[in-house]
Regions:
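Metallocofactor- and cofactor-centric catalytic cores in central/energy metabolism, strongly enriched
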Residues: 1-360
Length: 360
């Protein structure tokens, strides 16, 4: 029962991540969010697998239908086909899952059912509980991971291979230093884009800084780095307090998952401004600037990003004279590998497969 509950918890974590990106994709397709849809190639490729018609239709119309299909798999209440599994899972695997009776109805349904059957006096059969555990696993994979990946590439474009200095020694002195921490890309995309504009470069210089530098903590760091040149990955969630302890960060922008409350205690020691952006993840003592519970202010994404950037500029001014120590530990990393970037680099997967077979 506890294992099933843990699986349901993991499903909701990644399912919530997928939900926000899918809401953003649908909003952008319906002109309710002023963000360009950059992943046309990804959208048109995936739509073929889902049998979504394209001929004579605009990119936004096709993107809207794709978002609807993925949202339906997230939240379907009536039993029906899990379309992402049908479209993207190998046929032999689907047959095995069907025979085992572990095909999910939807991400919402499997999390809901997992908590229902593991409550007092309900499912006492370990095999039945393990079936639900596996249903949660499939919903986690095909909505929490696959759908989230499709929607991210569809809205923000596919990241490319990049080479960068990483680790704690990559921190820079003299800049307005902003860390983005978490998993949700919509608001982060605008913070990074607007923060790199000439307008905000001039604002930073006006307060004596060399510019604005972004750093990635956890998954937001890597996701942002693939797409925006001015983001340096520093560490995973476990290293967050160590990074704050350098005294180099002016502002810490956190959304959801892997954001531990202890960062507030360390940030307070160095006057680092902490801003939360998700209604689902508040921190005591942090300022909250983000979407409301119903996402009624999604259209205000750029205004929210500007407000956060302005807070970072204010924090930089207030922190002048704060002792900073940056340990000299950094390495060069190459990141941003994907099937598409691999094919673009090698022409196909054949050279890579041959190298693996030849143990090269």
């Amino acid at each position: 029962r506890n294992m099933t509950r843990a699986a349901a918890g993991g499903l909701t974590q990644h399912g919530a991540h997928a939900r926000e990106i899918l809401i953003s994709l649908k909003a952008a397709a319906n002109d309710q969010l002023d963000i360009p849809i950059l992943g046309e190639e990804k959208i048109r490729t995936v739509c073929k697998a889902f049998n979504i018609p394209e001929e004579g239709r605009s990119l936004k119309e096709v993107a809207n239908d794709l978002a609807d299909v993925l949202l339906e798999d997230l939240s379907r209440a009536l039993p029906g086909e899990y379309k992402t599994i049908t479209a993207l899972a190998p046929a032999e695997r689907r047959e095995v899952w069907k025979n085992l009776d572990i095909l999910p109805i939807s991400a919402y349904n499997e999390a809901f059912d997992a908590y229902h059957r593991t409550c007092v006096g309900t499912d006492g059969d370990w095999e039945s509980n393990m079936k639900q555990f596996l249903r949660c696993g499939l919903a986690f994979t095909f909505t929490g991971v696959v759908a989230a990946d499709i929607a991210t590439d569809a809205l923000f474009g596919q990241g490319g291979r990049r080479t960068s200095k990483v680790n704690i020694g990559a921190l820079k002195k003299g800049y307005v230093n902003i860390a983005v921490h978490g998993h949700l890309p919509t608001l982060v995309s605008q913070i990074c884009t607007i923060g790199a504009s000439e307008e905000y470069l001039e604002k930073a210089k006006a307060i004596g800084a060399k510019g604005i530098q972004f750093y990635g903590i956890c998954c937001s760091g890597l996701s942002s780095m693939y797409r925006y040149e001015n983001v340096i990955p520093l560490c995973n969630a476990i290293g967050a307090e160590l990074v704050l302890g350098t005294g180099a960060l002016d502002c810490w922008v956190a959304d959801v998952q892997d954001v531990y409350p202890a960062i507030m205690d360390v940030a307070r020691c160095f006057n680092t401004k902490v801003i939360t952006t998700s209604d689902a993840a508040r921190l005591p003592g942090a300022e909250h600037i983000g979407y409301d519970h119903h996402h009624t202010n999604l259209a205000e994404t750029k205004e929210l990003a500007r407000k956060i950037l302005d807070r970072a500029l204010e924090a930089h001014e207030l922190r002048k004279g704060m002792p900073v120590f940056i340990p000299p530990y950094e390495i060069t990393a190459e990141v941003g590998f994907s099937p598409e970037s691999t094919v673009k680099h090698y022409g196909s997967f054949k050279p890579l497969a041959e190298a693996l077979k030849d143990r090269k």
